[in-house]
Amino acid sequence: MSTAMAMAAAASSSAAAATATTTAISNSTNTTASPATTNTINTTTKTITTSEVPLEPASNMAPKALEIEDSGRNEPEDLEHGAAKPLEQRKTTVVHTCPRPPGGYKYSMEFLYGIGSGMAGIPLNIPTPSSITPRTVRSTAPLLTTHMPLLTNMGVAPSRPSGIRYPGSAGGSNGTTVAASTTPSTTVTTSSGSPGSGAEAITSSVSSSGLPAAGLQAAQFICQGYMPTGPQRRLWHAENAVWQFDRNYPYNQAYSPPYGIPMMPVGFEHPYGQRIIYPGYYNQTPPGINPAAVAGLTRTNRPVTQQPHILTQPAVGTTESSEEAPATLGNAPQVSSTWRYGRPGTHRGRHAVPTAAAPALLHRDSKSFYNSIGSGMANGPRFKAPFVANVRNFQAGAVATVAAGGAATTAVVGTSAPATGAASSSDQNVATKRNHQGAATQNNHRNRHNAKKGGKNSVGKELTSNSSESLSNSSSKSQLNKRPSSSSSISPIKHPHRNYRNRMRYTATEPTEQKAATTTVPISNYQPPQQSTSTVRRTSKFQGSNAYQAHTAAGRQQSRFYQSRHMDGYVFQSGHYMVYAAGAPPVGLRPGKSPVSEATGAPPGAAAATAAAATAVAATAAAAEGGGAAEGGGAAAAPVTASSATLEGEQPLDSDFDQRQEFADLGLDPANGGFSSDLEPNGIKQDTSELDTHSCLISHPNSEVDGDDNQSLASFAPSVESDDSDSELSDASVESVARDILVSCLAVATGAEEPDFSGPNLVPYGDMHYLKELDKKNPPTNGYRSHRPYHQSHYAYHSQMSPRGLSCCGDMLNQHSEDLVFKLDQNQPDGIESGKNIFLREITEQPDNISVASNLSCSPSASSSKSVLAPMASKSNITMPEENNDDDELPLVVHNRYWREFFGYTPADRFLLRAKFVEMRRPPKVMGCKNKWDPLSLSVWKKFLESQQTRHVYKIKMRLWRAIYTVAMKNYPRYGLYLVGSSISYFGSKCSDMDICMLACTNPNIDSRMEAVYHLHVMKELLGRTNMFQDFNLIEARVPILRFTDRCHKVEVDINFNNSVGIRNTHLLYCYSQLDWRVRPMALTVKQWAQYHNINNAKNMTISSYSLMLMVIHFLQVGASPPVLPCLHNLYPEKFGLLQPNDFGYVDMNEVMAPYQSDNSQTLGDLLLSFLHYYSVFDYGKYAISIRVGGVLPIEVCRAATAPKNDIHQWNELCIEEPFDQTNTARSVYDTDTFERIKTIFVASYRRLDSTRNLSAIFEDYDGPTILMQQPSVDSEIELYEGQHHRLLPNRGSSRSNSAIPSPRPSILMVDKATTAIWDDINNKPDHPVLSHSNNYDATNECTGNGSLMGLKDNSVADKPPIA
């Protein structure tokens, strides 16, 4: 027998006098120990009735344990005799490579990845091995097949008495047997392993010290089965890889699909060359720790320092306080557990104390091959016991009982004299190794708790592991990326917090008021919280959907979408492992609170009585635990030295939870929102300095979480984002899960992806690949940085083909959109690795692929992030970028109409979901209220609210788009219909029409105009067969337009053909609208003003709406001082580069642009007046407006531009450069007289607005010059659009028109409502406009001097715009 059994025997013999029954305990099977543990498990439970267990020193056992710890062996016979072996024998592992699971994989990755290639309509038939019994109870232990090498950094764990399932308390001693005032009745649950099963090595692999020693780790392997009564979790097993259709699969944290095939095995080679092991795959006794960081050395290569155990100071009688022993140099911190506050469960080794009894298991102590609480098999449960949300710090000592009024009994505080050497030297040694904080005081306790509700933790910051804290030595999840001694730089983990799903099946403890801890609670005497039966009881999986409904109303569980692309953050970093110093009360308890009173809400006075009367969940008495109680008693008198959040024991493990601190600052309580960790007390703050707060806020809404709820039920309940809200597999949710499985299988089979309407969309919508992180609820990108010049690669790309050499417009959709997503931060989840540039090969004409390309790409149904890229990547003409997500490699060649028809999904459905963002309902808080412009600003804001596109109108347009799209796709799936214009650029008004760009295959041998007329005629015939539209008018201009009206809502629709520049400039306006809140009110007010004065109609040779928007943006860039808007072309030249021939480009119409930090604080009224002033004095004869350069350009330069569509005859009166094709967007303003009258309206409006400061002076009360419309004549439309003079509008049909008069060629009539003298002044104008005030103008507002308007009060407008 092992020394552990000898220790148990000694302890049992010492307790025999006081007990009526003794229990023979043999070693239990530990699933994380040697793989030879193969035999069945016999669990026996006996009741030991004791009145008191005397304290007996077991000092004769301490040298044996220490000797075994240093021996490097865990063989039972050697442990029995105390034979030590050299330390060299434990260095038997491969450093960076995790061996594959025993037995290998039954199915290769190629097979798993290729399952969906031809499985449409074929049921899945992947056999489940005998080691997996889904949703059933396994009665036998799994067969272990293969040994796996040990890790190099595994220390040798000292033995412990049999029956001790967990290592001793921090500060515990091997030579003490402690138990005092134990509960009258305790239950001992033991397991016996068959001889030769390898179970002997398990108990010896667990440290028996108070602070876990650097013991030899158990051999790593993946357990192949489940223990009795354990929840069935499907993992990678020794015999094969199984389909992960169970959402109780929270342990592979970087695997892409929520259902489906895992993307990579457990032991895989990371691109960085480091091994990645996730916590929970390997259940192993954690290694010893090297207190001194070794810079530049990975933890698997770092030597393990063997140090003696911590000797603890005995508690004084039954008092509730203890003194802090002086620190000694002989007791350095040693840890054999990576649990944050000790091994969880009914009793931890660190906190091994008698516990109040409850036959049911806590929700984190469920018996599985991880946990096996009752039978002591797996070094303790994988999850900790329930904890209280408000725990921010922990006293050095385990809570036994807390008395009310100063009278209480101490359950277990006894210790022996040899254990008084250095009670808290572990704490002090750990604290002295940190620069943050030493021993904390009670005030620090209170302060760190209060920090949970808002402020940052000024004392220290910490991070925790995501899924589990049973970390392996080589687990990159245990990286301490905050350690100052670290020499490696690690990017934050790129996936959000993942909740433990089964947690919802357990009720939360009642929120109790936190009280200041006034007593010292020994850390070693851990007693788990005793809850009521209804509170502790675990709900059955098939109990029904209402089993947990009452406990899940306060929050939502976070979604579990994790992709292998997030693996980029998993790299090794030199630094310490988790060292949990003494000072942590049991998980779920607040300092100074009784576990009973904390769990049941009982007053502290009743805590001791309740604890004494309750029956223990498992063996925690000294007689039952043997040396375990001795270990626990070693730290009984640990002082009130609360370990800092940044001490050795609380170093950051993972940046999965760094969102929480920032979210606390944003008003989201991390303990109550979805960011609370279910692996640690909810109150603990995390560091968020490395994550994008806005992105996290977008991807993790927690609006339903009550900020005052101390129990943080948010993580118990499903979230809206999660695709299975009935997550606990009740009878109702099983059907939902099965339906989701079917959808996922169909998605794999059809080469598409189930529609997720919460993500953004593209215009065109053929490729949504790079938006996958948004579809997966991860932080969105705002596309600021590129890793290669966009236009340079496209120059080479287009030089290989004729000007119209694209075989299909689908080829332009092939381009991976991520090369147009320019990262603001390299650490963003979907950041492109440097070197992963996209190289476009020469596209060859492949007639046989035209239909496939068009079907896959032209159809907006391919709006998923996979449906287009994978089939196009299979073609030989494009090299797709590398992606970590291997599911994109599936051979997806199925026609996407199948997927569209299956779901009935169109791109308009995505835009329908953003209808709530269309309207601005409230003025921003920054709007000034105390200056002279306040009435005018409010009038401008009111005008904007009245004229902006409402949510109702927006939805009408989206549904109309969907109807047109559906009609077209049923007959011509190669067509692409994309909504452009002000309807989706946030500049739309109530009366705005709809502009649709139709994309289709082009033939280079056919004239583009004739081809456009043909396709528009086809569309007219298709739509004419329905009864939805009327008044069709096909305008065969140079840019043909099909115009018609909706019968129901009378919405005017314009469809153009292959006008790709409309897609780009729509996206540009959409981006500008997000940079400053004043842009949209200014633009809409100017548009309303222009429409009121009849100068906003390109058909009438006036300014189009798009040109007006460019004028507003140009003014905000140049005319306002300081500028309100930047020049996006200068900031992001690759993103907004010139449009290349036949290059439609990719834009994200849901792109999030950060607001521009402008120093301009002018109000809306001030900006409107400045706008009118700026364009009243603008020198239109010399300069052209250009938002591309952020200034003005000489007209000669614009005429000389070599753009393919540029025409020197277009640059006449009003010159506004199109930022993408360098044409003149205001080419409709070619008549000199008309333009002069337009300028007069600018001048007159400015003078009236400046004199009255009333917006109605330029609207309802305006009586100056204007342009009146005559009824349309019967002249031919061809004469209008195909005029003989070269200055006639060549692309008139493509201009955006808000006019209610669809008929062409109206007559122009100028009317002077005041006097005719103004026209004489205009005709005889000098270099700068000189205006004679009319009779109704206020004489005090006349311009003086030479008549120039330069002398006006507004000094914010530049006299001359800058020349680019």
From Swiss-Prot:
Reactions performed catalytically: RNA(n) + ATP = RNA(n)-3'-adenine ribonucleotide + diphosphate
Stretches with biased composition (Basic residues): 445-455, 494-504
Composition-biased stretches (Basic and acidic residues): 66-91
InterPro entries (UniProt xref): MTPAP-like_central, NT_sf, PAP_assoc
GO molecular function, one term: RNA binding
A Gene Ontology BP annotation from the UniProt entry: mRNA 3'-end processing
Domain PAP-associated: from-to ranges: 1163-1224
Span list, region Disordered: 27-97, 159-203, 315-338, 417-535, 666-732
Ranges of biased composition (kind: Polar residues): 427-444, 509-535
Keyword terms of this UniProt record: ATP-binding, Cytoplasm, Magnesium, Manganese, Metal-binding, mRNA processing, Nucleotide-binding, Nucleus, RNA-binding, Transferase
Binding site for Mg(2+): 993, 995
Keyword Cytoplasm attributed: yes
Entry GO terms, CC: cytoplasm; neuron projection; nucleoplasm
UniProt-reported outcome of changing residue 995 to A: Destroys active site
Database matches in Pfam families: MTPAP-like_central, PAP_assoc
EC number(s) given by UniProt: 2.7.7.19
Biased composition (Low complexity): 27-51, 175-198, 417-426, 461-493
Localization, UniProt: Cytoplasm; Nucleus
Keyword RNA-binding: yes
Expression by tissue: Expressed in the brain.
Cofactor entry: Mg(2+); Mn(2+)
Function: Cytoplasmic poly(A) RNA polymerase that adds successive AMP monomers to the 3'-end of specific RNAs, forming a poly(A) tail. In contrast to the canonical nuclear poly(A) RNA polymerase, it only adds poly(A) to selected cytoplasmic mRNAs. Required for formation of long term memory.
Subunit structure: Interacts with Fmr1 and eIF-4E.
Name this polypeptide is given: Poly(A) RNA polymerase gld-2 homolog A
Lineage: Eukaryota, Metazoa, Ecdysozoa, Arthropoda, Hexapoda
